[in-house]
Amino acid sequence: EGLMRTVIKNCPIALENPEDYDARANLMWASSLALNGLTGRGKQGVWSCHPMEHELSAFYDITHGIGLAILTPRWMNYVLSEQTVGKFAQFARNVWGIVEQEEEVAAKKGIQALYDYFVACGIPMTLPEVGIEADKFEEMAQQAVDHSAIAEKAYVPLDAADIAAIYKDCLTESQFI
């Protein structure tokens, strides 16, 4: 959560002033910690968005981070359930500072905050904006299942139909609250 707050604080500063050494250093430090495996210690499973995005990057020439930004809020919304609502409400409260007693409302506000943040950073937020249409969704979804443990070991296991549905959700702009 602290790493996410660091990125949320420093990314707009670095975008506004690319010469801001402190903002860039904080982003690099947060990125290093996020990617070195430390944050996953003691946790099980795979994060579903990575294998889903790997297929977008394999089939189309897009940046991994942009694909993740497009997918993540839609994935969160798709898997939002009694099983996940507590974790997503915690994300909303601890990362975004959302004050909301109702768990589902807090979770949806957190998902919306993430989506709006990506928009504010100037990130394309639909697949058509990065040149991806629906014609290969089923094939990419099956590849995501075949090339990962997403169907068995993910936080919320997903099959190819689930993944194709998430891709479809990424065709248009979204509202979560």
Question: Model-found features: residue ranges?
Answer:
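C-terminal charged capping/lid subdomain of soluble metabolic enzymes
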Residues: F88, V95-I177
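Active-site segments that bind and position negatively charged phosphate/pyrophosphate groups
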Residues: E1-A113
